[in-house]
From Swiss-Prot:
It is found in: Cytoplasm. The lineage of its organism: Bacteria, Pseudomonadati, Campylobacterota, Epsilonproteobacteria, Campylobacterales. SUPFAM superfamilies: Elongation factor Ts (EF-Ts), dimerisation domain (SSF54713), UBA-like (SSF46934). It comes from Helicobacter pylori (strain G27). Residues 82-85 are annotated as: Involved in Mg(2+) ion dislocation from EF-Tu. Associates with the EF-Tu.GDP complex and induces the exchange of GDP to GTP. It remains bound to the aminoacyl-tRNA.EF-Tu.GTP complex up to the GTP hydrolysis stage on the ribosome. The gene is tsf. One of its GO terms (cellular component) is cytoplasm. One of its GO terms (molecular function) is translation elongation factor activity. Keywords: Cytoplasm, Elongation factor, Protein biosynthesis. This is Elongation factor Ts. Belongs to the EF-Ts family.
C-alpha cells in the first residue's frame, strides 16, 4: 500500500460509498489512479454509488432561474428516487450548485455539465459524491439555457410544487413595451404549465404524427357522438383533417368553393355569400385543427380568456401596443415525464438493498 495516502482512500470512499478496505485494495490494484479505482469497484460490484446509479430516479425537482434583465434563463430537471430526498437540504444545495455551474460555463446539455468543473473538480465527481452522501440515485436529466437577442426577452414560471417549469421567449420591436412583454411571457408560461402543450406551433409536427393523431381523434369523436345520440344531444362534426399544416391553399380554396356551391343550391343570392362564407370557413378551420388546439401552444385557447387562442392573444397585444410580437422560444419540463418507474414489491426491494 506504499504511496496510497489516507486522503486518497477517503476520497474514493466518499465517491463510491464502498468499504474502507475495499477502497485501499482498489487503489493498490490500479497504482493509485482514482478513476480506475472507481471503475475497479464498480466492476467488482463494491461501489454502492454505482448500485444506486442503476436505480430509477423519477422524482426530484424542476428548477429555473431568470436573469433580472430577462435576457437569459436556465431550467433544469434533476431526478431522485423519492420525493422525500428532493426536499432535504443537501439535495437543494445540489440544485443550487447545478444552476450556478450551468450559468458559469454556459452549459446547454447534461453531457456538458458532467464534463464541466465545480470547485476545481469535475462536476461528475461532485455528483457521484452526492449520490453516496444522500443515498439515492441522482440524475441531471434535462437542461434548457436560453439567451435573448436584442429586442427579445425570456421569462418563465415554475409551479410551486417544483414539478413543472416553463420558459418562454418573445421577440418585440418597441422597447417601451418591454415590461408588458415580460409580463405577457410569464402569463403564457403559466398557461403552458397548466395546459401541457407539446410544441410551440403546428409546424413542429411531422405529417405522419398528424395523420396518426387524426385517426385517433376521429375515433374519439365518433364514440362521443354515439353517446350524444343516445342522450339526444347535438353531435360533433367529424373532421377530415387534424392540423393547420394539412390545410393548404388548395384545400381551403376547394372548401370555399364547396360552401359557395352549397349556398347556390340553397338559392341564396350571390351578393350575400361574402357575409356567410367567412363564418363557415372559420368553423371549418376550427373543426379541422383540433390537434393544434390540444397540443400546440399557439393553437390552445388561453386559460385567462378562453375565447382566444394564444396566437390571437399575441396578435391582439401587438395591435394594442403598436408592436410586432412573436413567441420564439417555448420549453416545458415536467418532472419524470417519459420515465417508466418500476413497481417492486417489498420483498424484492429488501433483496435489492441487501445486494
Amino acid at each position: 500500500m506504499s504511496g496510497i495516502s489516507a486522503q486518497l482512500v477517503k476520497k474514493l470512499r466518499d465517491l463510491t460509498d464502498a468499504g474502507m478496505m475495499d477502497c485501499k485494495k482498489a487503489l493498490v490494484e490500479v497504482a493509485g489512479d482514482l478513476q480506475k479505482a472507481i471503475d475497479f469497484l464498480r466492476e467488482k460490484g463494491l461501489s454502492k454509488a454505482a448500485k444506486k446509479a442503476d436505480r430509477i430516479a423519477a422524482e426530484g425537482v424542476v428548477a429555473l432561474e431568470v436573469a433580472p434583465d430577462f435576457k437569459s434563463a436556465m431550467m433544469v430537471e434533476i431526478n431522485s428516487e423519492t420525493d422525500f430526498v428532493a426536499k432535504n437540504e443537501g439535495f437543494k444545495e445540489l440544485v443550487k450548485k447545478t444552476l450556478e455551474t450551468i450559468k458559469a460555463h454556459n452549459i446547454h446539455t447534461p453531457e456538458e455539465l458532467l464534463k464541466s468543473q465545480l470547485d476545481n473538480k469535475p462536476f461528475e465527481e461532485y455528483l457521484h459524491s452526492q449520490i453516496a452522501v444522500i443515498g439515492e440515485n441522482i440524475l441531471v436529466r434535462k437542461i434548457a439555457h436560453l439567451k435573448a437577442l436584442s429586442s427579445h426577452i425570456v421569462n418563465g414560471y415554475a409551479h410551486s410544487n417544483a414539478r413543472v417549469g416553463v420558459l418562454i421567449g418573445i421577440k418585440y420591436n418597441n422597447e417601451k413595451n418591454a415590461p408588458k412583454v415580460v409580463e405577457l411571457a410569464r402569463n403564457i408560461a403559466m398557461h403552458a404549465a397548466a395546459m401541457k402543450p407539446q410544441v410551440l406551433d403546428c409546424k413542429d409536427f411531422s405529417l405522419d404524427f398528424v395523420k396518426k393523431e387524426t385517426l385517433a381523434l376521429i375515433a374519439e369523436i365518433e364514440k362521443d357522438n354515439e353517446e350524444a345520440k343516445r342522450l339526444g344531444k347535438p353531435l360533433k362534426n367529424i373532421p377530415t383533417f387534424g392540423s393547420r399544416i394539412e390545410l393548404s391553399d388548395e384545400v381551403l380554396a376547394h372548401q370555399k368553393k364547396a360552401f359557395e356551391n352549397e349556398l347556390k343550391e340553397q338559392g341564396k343570392p350571390e351578393k350575400i355569400w361574402d357575409k356567410i362564407v367567412p363564418g363557415k370557413m372559420e368553423r371549418f378551420i376550427a373543426d379541422n385543427t383540433l390537434i393544434d388546439q390540444r397540443l400546440t401552444l399557439l393553437g390552445q385557447f388561453y386559460v385567462m380568456d378562453d375565447k382566444k387562442t394564444i396566437a390571437q392573444v399575441v396578435a391582439d397585444c401587438s395591435k394594442e401596443w403598436d408592436d410586432d410580437l412573436k413567441i420564439t422560444e417555448y420549453v416545458r419540463f415536467e418532472l419524470g415525464e417519459g420515465i417508466e418507474k418500476k413497481a417492486e414489491n417489498f420483498a424484492e426491494e429488501v433483496a435489492l438493498q441487501m445486494k
